[in-house]
Amino acid sequence: MFGLIGHLTSLEHAQAVAEDLGYPEYANQGLDFWCSAPPQVVDNFQVKSVTGQVIEGKYVESCFLPEMLTQRRIKAAIRKILNAMALAQKVGLDITALGGFSSIVFEEFNLKQNNQVRNVELDFQRFTTGNTHTAYVICRQVESGAKQLGIDLSQATVAVCGATGDIGSAVCRWLDSKHQVKELLLIARNRQRLENLQEELGRGKIMDLETALPQADIIVWVASMPKGVEIAGEMLKKPCLIVDGGYPKNLDTRVKADGVHILKGGIVEHSLDITWEIMKIVEMDIPSRQMFACFAEAILLEFEGWRTNFSWGRNQISVNKMEAIGEASVKHGFCPLVAL
């Protein structure tokens, strides 16, 4: 059985959907309450592959909120993720994806040292960040979006915002090895990590956001920012493709300009309906079929019997692993969201 650990996009979102999640008493509560709220299994469902195989899964709501990071409630954030992982293990989930900020909190605060959660010793082989599948899906979205807009990738300038992260660095490797894109613009906060990535790739220009964006034919946004940013659409190239791989996805409401096309990055659509409630709550356009690619990775690992931490650690994603999870994705009926 597989699992998905997720969270809501904000305190306001959490209050609005608390009743749908099954705990209406949380609806009027503030951040202090959510900091102490325990994780809960809020959805049970089946997923059917186009091969005919059927598997069962559970959704674990961690009760983590991005405000816990922005308001420096770090201990609460750490506790949320570890407690949700412990619950997933206690209810017998064989492979569980850490969705949204869950994997970021785990990596940034080095939680692999915290493997004892009360009476549960965490087995990290039972968890995956889902980042390999997410990176694969974003790359396929770049390829499809570029084709739809008539952008030749071999002649394109691609800016990757969040280039040193797990997903961003994987996207850079794919675009370099598969397409030899003309220019890779590397954007991130940590200069040393940028220089390390540049050395690994043997290419790429390190730039700040304001300098890079006007030069880019394609922008891949995979920065882990709890709050959205402002991008002036008029300063971007036309046409310009933006693949919004962040969470929550809000660039489509923040960047409005003719000739600027935005794809919801890291989203896949399944060929068959899934009877779950959670994707309605996170406001997918077609909740019975669409989901985050990181969640789909846990589903694929369960279908394939690869019960291991397929995506784990920082900057470990190879093009070969992206190809492997991509083949499984196609085999079981998933496809990236590519309609502009």
Curated annotation (Swiss-Prot):
Native source species: Synechocystis sp. (strain ATCC 27184 / PCC 6803 / Kazusa)
NCBIfam families with a match to the protein in the record: AcACP_reductase
Pfam families: Shikimate_DH
MF (Gene Ontology): oxidoreductase activity
PANTHER family recorded: NADP-DEPENDENT 3-HYDROXY ACID DEHYDROGENASE YDFG (PTHR43086:SF3), VERY-LONG-CHAIN 3-OXOOACYL-COA REDUCTASE (PTHR43086)
Keyword field: NAD, Oxidoreductase
Similarity remark: Belongs to the short-chain dehydrogenases/reductases (SDR) family.
Function, in words: Catalyzes the NADP-dependent reduction of long-chain acyl-ACP to the corresponding fatty aldehyde. Involved in the biosynthesis of alkanes, mainly heptadecane and pentadecane, by producing the fatty aldehydes used by aldehyde decarbonylase.
Listed EC numbers: 1.2.1.80
Signal peptide bounds: none
Catalytic activity: a long-chain fatty aldehyde + holo-[ACP] + NADP(+) = a long-chain fatty acyl-[ACP] + NADPH + H(+); a long-chain fatty aldehyde + holo-[ACP] + NAD(+) = a long-chain fatty acyl-[ACP] + NADH + H(+)
UniProt keyword NAD, yes or no: yes
Cofactor(s) this protein cannot do without: a divalent metal cation
Enzyme superclass (EC): oxidoreductase
Protein name listed in UniProt: Long-chain acyl-[acyl-carrier-protein] reductase
Disruption phenotype: Abolishes the presence of alkanes.
